[in-house]
Amino acid sequence: MAFVHIRCLCFILLCTITGYSLEIKVNPPQDFEILDPGLLGYLYLQWKPPVVIEKFKGCTLEYELKYRNVDSDSWKTIITRNLIYKDGFDLNKGIEGKIRTHLSEHCTNGSEVQSPWIEASYGISDEGSLETKIQDMKCIYYNWQYLVCSWKPGKTVYSDTNYTMFFWYEGLDHALQCADYLQHDEKNVGCKLSNLDSSDYKDFFICVNGSSKLEPIRSSYTVFQLQNIVKPLPPEFLHISVENSIDIRMKWSTPGGPIPPRCYTYEIVIREDDISWESATDKNDMKLKRRANESEDLCFFVRCKVNIYCADDGIWSEWSEEECWEGYTGPDSKIIFIVPVCLFFIFLLLLLCLIVEKEEPEPTLSLHVDLNKEVCAYEDTLC
């Protein structure tokens, strides 16, 4: 009987606790919206506090914010106590977000209490047909010094169509227009940007729009981080040597410019006679074993890019000039052999000339004899 009473008591307590939890409710935030301040994709997600029940006025409110581009499979999630959150988006696609209120556990006897979700969305107007939008947009940050972006005109545009590029990154007061366009047939097909102060490791936003008297032009948006599209100069001053007839030692200098030496990774192609293979290193030298001791020549060339310690991605530089070490039977060895042989033959020729010259009679001696004969004959005649 006592056991039955205990079970009844537990049931009553459970119902009481559950009933209390069910009575705790919190409202969602108010006026949730996504705002575009004109920064080419850097948007503000903002809201107002919920209407709070009197007994929860001393409680700390937190907000769970989720947002994404509409074609993304995953949401970004933020827990914050602020009433605004800022982030970059791809404006080529729509944006959607949702938010709800969280009550802190000390106000709810340790249970989690959340409000329903409220949602908001944002998208730019699709002015102009998709075929008028630029094609093949490419941007390269050359040697971490200047940015070059290029594009092709839309598939179906009138001859009077021209494009304009704007850019923005955190630190600028407003979006700026390109001041140095690349042109083809007097049309803008690219832009060069220099002196991008404090622009690394933050989102870099670009918009290319166009104008035509005959039709509207669809805008194109791009967002990236500059350090991830760096294309360095190729390595310089290559040198290769062979030690102990076996060890190949290769050295090169890091390219000139602002990129720290620790930020490079290298790809090396080694050629030994007609065989070649690849290797990689984060240093500016490498030591390998020869694959064939009788090889007549060894050559290598190298390229570089920014490594994972300084960027999430990068673009390989052009290949360096090829540098070669030639074996002992190479052209240099032949020259060393030919020169002394030629000198030896020249010496023999000179010696032979001297010997021949000594064996021939002197012409002055025969002339002297003939003169004496003529004098004697002349004297006999006089007598």
Swiss-Prot record:
Intervals, Extracellular compartment: 22-334
Superkingdom field: Eukaryota
Membrane-spanning segments: 335-355
Cellular compartments per GO CC: external side of plasma membrane; extracellular region; extracellular space; plasma membrane
Gene Ontology molecular function: cytokine receptor activity
Claim: Lipid metabolism is one of the keywords in the record: no
Gene3D superfamilies, alphabetized: Immunoglobulins (2.60.40.10)
GO term, biological process aspect, one: immunoglobulin mediated immune response
Disruption phenotype: Il13ra2-deficient mice have greatly reduced levels of IL-13 in the serum but significantly greater tissue levels of IL-13 when compared with wild-type mice. Thus, regulates serum and tissue levels of IL-13.
Pfam families for this protein: IL6Ra-bind
InterPro entries: FN3_dom (IPR003961), FN3_sf (IPR036116), Ig-like_fold (IPR013783), Short_hematopoietin_rcpt_2_CS (IPR003532), TypeI_recpt_CBD (IPR015321)
UniProt-annotated glycosylation sites, renumbered to this chain: N109, N162, N209, N293
Family to which this protein belongs: Belongs to the type I cytokine receptor family. Type 5 subfamily.
Listed name of the protein: Interleukin-13 receptor subunit alpha-2
Species of provenance: Mus musculus (Mouse)
Lineage, broadest ranks: Eukaryota, Metazoa, Chordata, Craniata, Vertebrata
